[in-house]
Amino acid sequence: MESSAKLSFARLSPRKTRLVVDMVRGKGIQNALNTLRFSPQPSAKLVSKLLSSAVANAEQKGVADVDRLYVKTIYVNGGTVLKRFVPRAMGRASKIRKPTSHICVVLAEKK
């Protein structure tokens, strides 16, 4: 049985978040959460929260053994980019891009 969780419009760069997501793909739940706990990247906290949510969804569905869950699929897609302008010298303005990410995780039971 599979369970999933999604996080939309996270104020994280998709490129930097993919580095964190690649560390936990295919790992067991406890191993993945421990890896994220000791990761210095800011996106690791949100990804671990998302994994915990997916585990809670699995418990709600009635998965027999939560300890047998592993990260089957996890991916990051780019969301909309918030564009802001900051005033510069001589009446100019510079563009500031604030990227967002959509993160999706699917957990499955080991056979």
From Swiss-Prot:
One of its GO terms (molecular function) is structural constituent of ribosome. SUPFAM superfamilies: Ribosomal protein L22. One of its GO terms (cellular component) is cytosolic large ribosomal subunit. The keyword rRNA-binding applies. GO terms for biological process: translation. Keywords: Ribonucleoprotein, Ribosomal protein, RNA-binding, rRNA-binding. This protein binds specifically to 23S rRNA; its binding is stimulated by other ribosomal proteins, e.g. L4, L17, and L20. It is important during the early stages of 50S assembly. It makes multiple contacts with different domains of the 23S rRNA in the assembled 50S subunit and ribosome. The globular domain of the protein is located near the polypeptide exit tunnel on the outside of the subunit, while an extended beta-hairpin is found that lines the wall of the exit tunnel in the center of the 70S ribosome. Belongs to the universal ribosomal protein uL22 family. Part of the 50S ribosomal subunit. This is Large ribosomal subunit protein uL22. It comes from Geotalea uraniireducens (strain Rf4) (Geobacter uraniireducens). The gene is rplV.
